[in-house]
């Protein structure tokens, strides 16, 4: 019985020493068992290495074991396992059931139990307890030593859950985590390790369970040899936590304590001192890095490096692209094999998709060493969403998640038809399952669409029944059962009824034919996992009574614990993985990507259920559990050391300066540390683009990515830029290659591509727009924003998918409608705005809204609590608005005379006729919200008011650009009609926008009601253009003094208007605007009828017409495409606008 340490720094040859020692023992023909004990993840590599050292005849004399394998060997020899193992999925389902049963008895975790991930957290802490040999009884016996209620109650909850878990588990099962505890007990009876010599390699630490096993092995074996990656042995002394080798030295101390307690001999250690070490014999740079990375003081390496390189990149994509180029270069220039290369990162999740995409493009064979979650696999999605449909009562999300799995007998066209119908009509819940046929209706401006053809409606209902029938049957079968076992049986029957097993088998065969072996393996495993989870539910809680919702949660919990492990399909491929899963030292070349702060080294992990303080307190009381986060952070140093010393020939560290969203990333402290050691390190970057053939050569690698670079350079050449001669030779190579020539020619033709189609035939436009042209003024403004957007919306009549909701425009129309009805009711009752009773007015608003909802069958406003809130908000806004209108009218002499004044064939006034230069007449239609009149000095002054549910400014420059024409053309039309029809001398008074809102007034505690009302009036001040006449202005605001709080005007002390602080125009200027608006509309309409459909959105300093355009996917506007340019509109000062308008009218 003895223990011997084999120690040395990384790369010193410890593993090789073990293999050679085993070989020597075999050659010496010593008759004793020879065992190599390694971590589970290293067992495959260790077996390979052992076979390489030993010949086929002697290889069988040595066993390569992990602790788990050792346990199975002993159990097979002496017995001990009479029950089946429960996997992580079964444990999670059992824990969920225990927590649900005991949630009212939990003191700390009652609320936390509902949180996602809580079951996994509890499972992890129980695993931790078991690995540290802590039982529920030990926790209970130590409760009296715990001070502080929070920790005490926490441990009581954990003891309760842990105790019931153990009791229920051991009825039929055994936990995987119990294997080593049982192994330690059974080793006394085992004979296979008697007098054995054991080599233990690749461990940096052990759990208490493993120490118990080692103690028993030490008492039975001839000798145990343990490798320690350290510079020197600690020999039981105090360990400095800042020492990079502190985890190893802690392990050494614990092993020394075991042999001291058992009076076991300590053999002379084997010290593997080397310079250089075997691993770094071909690289002085890597040897220097190993020696100095964590040495203080360190020694500088002043020569230029070639084996250690750094790369600074613009983002993660260019980082991986540069990595791929470097891998290709190494393989071509230096004969490196893909299997000798590894790419690792501290953020595999963030890099996985980028690496997959880039490496596939560069034809680099690779395998991502990680277990895949199964939650997003279509089979799992189908099962869980089918149950979610029932547990959540047929919500849109759950139904279409189920239907879109691709595993049902519904094709994509049927899916789209059904989904469009459901979205347009807000179908959910009982509407899916009632016997009534669906009637086609949709919500838009309170009007039902025309009846859809009977064939389409019948088709929709057929698809509906085909979609819902299996789940309706499933629900029917669920209603007659209440046991977990029965739920599993019914679900399995459902899966068979939809032919899921056969469909999965067909998919697996298809994947194999297409060469997608990983996919085939994944789908094969998934079905087996589903069956395994159902079996475990039956065996663990099969006879317990549960509800459908509980069954859904239990199944979801069980499936969420599964991950799929895939086997590398070939040997010669680049290994891609996480820093923590780096498995082999047989790596020549290592790329560490994402060497950024917070990624490598990894940041401190969250403390979990037990905080650092909790762990320290429990440790002080004799309850040793896993290390706190600070201790783990110190141990991270050793992980960094192990990672950096893994490659034997070449190491490259790269870091981007920004992530995928453009957020700044800082380089890791590792970068600065290495730069200090290697003062002349090879450092590259792709941020500053260098010119020259040597730089261009870096972009020539595999055919596909090189082709992309070629096309980019050919485009530059076409556009007149100078490119390197090397691309001419590259172009010739692709021209001579049959596979590429067609693609090359096709893409070169694409250089002439433009998405522009500036004009189409007048005849076609006439067919689309109609003749004679009859359009609203708002459409004219739309054309000014972008001719193409107008064409798509009003020519092609393209519509966005209809959704059952109340859009902002719908809300505005609804409020306009209520205000119009209220205004007419006011007239009908013979009441005036300025004298009406406010209580009556508010009751009338309530009544009108309720009537409107009933009459129009607007189910949406009663469809949810949210829309009920919207209805209440609309009532408040409208009540505030009628109060505000009344206050405005009280302040002036203008009287409301017209409401919703319309210009149309059947309107209050005829359409506004605009004669084009060709003699053709265009009819403009529209509606004015309100017109107030003032009779004064033989003239009738008009105040035109437009109600707006959002903010709206009046800008003279927008009038100039044709973006704000409505109020001016309505003014012109009304003045013209008054003069021609009635002989009335009409004059412009004001054009105003009134915002419909109920603003919140802040800091009202010390304000009187009058002050609050004044604040609201000021907040809702109207915007627009006012006649520059002090007398008329006072007729709009008779208490004006200084700045008006209802209109955009400021008067001076002498009574005159402050033009610089007011939005005003003289009578002559209004007349000029009337002429200009007519001129502009004629120009726009002529352009429209000439077939102008140019993609030309406007752009101003505060935004562009593209910002909220729904047709961007149609036009694909991009300033990088030839001919795609914004129509830049400069915000001009009013003086400039007046000058430009006059110049245009003079032409």
Swiss-Prot record:
One Pfam family hit: UvrD_C
Gene3D superfamilies for the chain: 3.90.320.10, 6.10.140.1030, P-loop containing nucleotide triphosphate hydrolases
Annotated positions binding ATP: 8-15
Family, per entry: Belongs to the helicase family. AddB/RexB type 1 subfamily.
HAMAP family (UniProt xref): AddB_type1
Note: Despite having conserved helicase domains, this subunit does not have helicase activity.
Protein name: ATP-dependent helicase/deoxyribonuclease subunit B
Organism of provenance: Clostridium botulinum (strain ATCC 19397 / Type A)
